[in-house]
Amino acid sequence: MKKSLLGIATSLIVLPTLSYADSPYFSFKDGDGFKRFSASIGWLHAMPQGKANNVNVNTSIAEGTTAKVGEVSKDAVLNAAVKDSNPLLYGALQLLPLETLPSGLSGTSTINGLSNWQADGTGLEADDVDTVGMMLNYHFTDHVSLEVKAGIPPKVDIKGKGDIYAPLSGSADTPLGSIDLKKDIHITDLTQGGKAASVRAWLPAAELHYQFGKSGVNKFRPYVGVGVMYAYFNDVKLNSGIESDLVAAGHMIQNIHDGQAGAALDGKTSSADPRVKVKTTDTFAPIATLGATYDFNENWFAAGSVSYSKMNNEAKISVTDNNTGKELGGVLKSMLTLNEAIIDVKES
């Protein structure tokens, strides 16, 4: 049985090789009046065209969560309380000769608005980038070729847009009465530091080209191409200021879980060890190219092209408690549209 399987496997590998050897389309020999292989190397400039999309934010605090408040500064309560919902209680809190309300007086809170929301006016945009690109072509005929293109993976700066606020709402129930809560808690400024993050981009592509004109006759030969691009991103580095802000937000969420909602309002550290992680999704996308070559002689040519590829890519920033592995919250997502302009010169 093993011998038979080996024979079948050998046949599958060898027979196609033998059959392609005599094909006019699959050969290592030059074609009739044209070269079978060509290579070019040069400048590659990528210009992302997509606009920033509002980021979605989620936390582990479900709608209607009831949590003990614990100790809390009076100023934090007054800043979050809706005065018109209970003017008498609001006035009484103002008159209390205390800077900090003890847990026996702060009571409990019912929390809404933190489970999931969209941060309006925010987003992430990739900056323009330059790198060295290489294009390899296999010519089936003088007009049809398969091109594989890639470049040295560049570092791409991701610019942030807007501020993220957490839309806290709910109510506080104290021994003195109840009062509504409503406060937009500032989480982070995505524009701080000039860039929100940096990422290394791998963007190989394969295209089928049709080239007009004829080798040896027309020096200038335009071409069109369609194919597929694969986008892979790694080595993601988040802005340190944004990372610190998200760690603080993680402490806020954990304080609510710990029955210390007042500490969350006061921005105190919690029992958690928040860590920020960034993940991006890989994606395939169609790509279209318009370009031209100019032959200087039999072996040297110049080529220039413009490619367009629309891709939808997601980036997720999560905050996890390193002590328990529990996710406290996450920020997602960014969608990018990529447009590449390519100029290259190399021996064919």
Positions of PLM-derived features:
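Cleavable N-terminal export/targeting peptides
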Residues: M1-D32
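Outer-membrane beta-barrel architecture
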Residues: D32-S40, T131-G133, S145, V199-A205, ...
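A mature extracytoplasmic/lumenal domain signature
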Residues: H45, A150-I152, V306-Y308
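Secretion/assembly modules of Gram-negative surface proteins
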Residues: Y20-A81, A126, M134-M135
